[in-house]
Regions:
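Helical "lid/coupling" subdomains associated with nucleotide-phosphate turnover
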Residues: 14, 33-69, 75, 81-146, ...
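Primarily extracytoplasmic ectodomains and periplasmic/lumenal surface modules that are beta-strand-rich
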Residues: 8-9, 19-21, 83
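Short, solvent-exposed loop/turn elements at domain surfaces
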Residues: 10, 22, 39-41
Length: 301
């Protein structure tokens, strides 16, 4: 069982291992609880408020299916929101994980993992998942590349024809060693990027559409993020796009080798052959703007 402690929320999914590379999803909790990084001021509440409600929903499902809780090991994996928090308040992160561990232990289910998922591993695992589901892990098939936009970070990964090189990592799958370029950019997730754009634009009106009625919604963003009144927003593509590019540039200056700056991705071996798909926030953007999902994100990169 996996607890995905993402920056925008915490979710629980129960899987059953399959005979192939995929796993069957048995159950997904019908609720999303607050992200762990939101408990920076009250870390002791992370377990009771973020993890316990999910475990309660799981326990009800286990009773229905006749599965013993002792047979369901729990892996809690936190991602970029907690990575960011660790940079500024490592003590809070330790307290948050102590709280989540206590909640899992109290559930009677065995604890397998309660930690931050390394950023490059997050990118590589997303790549493996996409190719396993697409049936493209075989050497004879063109492999899928992924562009994943989460709440606090963005990941890019694609097959590398070379065993070594910038950003190349080894991934062991079903007894085979695969090579992939896997990179993660902390700060380029949708929430963090939007916050940075708000700061640069002194309020961000050019990045939101005008809603003259002033209802549904009345405001964009929470008050803590310099919210914008929807009837005063004034979307303008050029200044908004320039601001987004500036935020990407800011993040790029913090990337150190062997990490890859975003501007270099297109020159790496394997990039031009990958069939990219968008995950996370990319999918939401396609839906919101009615963009055909066949659009190739490689062109945007």
């Amino acid at each position: 069982m996996v607890i995905d402690a993402g920056s925008s929320g915490t979710r629980l999914t129960l899987y059953a291992p399959g005979s192939d590379l995929t796993a069957s999803r048995i159950f997904r909790a019908p609720l999303t609880t607050p992200g762990l990084s939101s408990f920076v001021d009250n870390p002791g509440d992370a377990g009771p408020q973020s993890v316990t409600p999910l475990l309660d929903a799981l326990r009800d499902q286990l009773v229905t299916t006749g599965i013993s809780p002792s047979d369901v090991p729990i892996a809690l994996l936190a991602t970029a929101g907690v990575r960011l928090l660790k940079q500024t308040d490592p003590a809070a992160v330790r307290a948050i994980f102590a709280s989540t561990q206590a909640a899992i232990t109290a559930s009677g289910m065995p604890l397998r993992t309660n930690a931050i998922l390394p950023d490059v591993r997050e990118a590589a695992l997303a790549w493996v998942d996409a190719n396993a589901l697409s049936g493209t892990l075989d050497d004879t098939a063109p492999r899928v590349g992924i562009i994943e936009v989460g709440g606090a970070s963005a990941q890019v990964a694609f097959h590398s024809p070379r065993p070594r090189g910038p950003g190349v990592v080894q991934v062991r799958v079903d007894g085979r060693v695969l090579h992939t370029v896997a990179v993660s950019y902390l700060g380029l997730g949708s929430n963090e990027t939007r916050s940075a754009m708000q700061t640069r634009l002194n309020g961000g009106k050019p990045c939101f559409p005008n809603n003259a009625t002033g209802v549904n919604p009345k405001f964009y963003l929470a008050a803590s993020q310099r919210r914008v009144a929807s009837d005063r927003a004034d979307f303008r593509g050029s200044p908004c796009g320039r601001t987004y590019a500036a935020v990407i540039s800011d993040v790029a200056t913090t990337v150190k080798e062997p990490r890859i700056r975003p501007q270099r991705l297109g020159s790496l071996p394997g990039f031009s052959r990958a069939n990219f798909i968008g995950l996370g926030g990319v999918t939401f953007a396609y839906t919101d703007f009615a963009i055909p999902t066949t659009a190739d994100p490689r062109r945007a990169l």
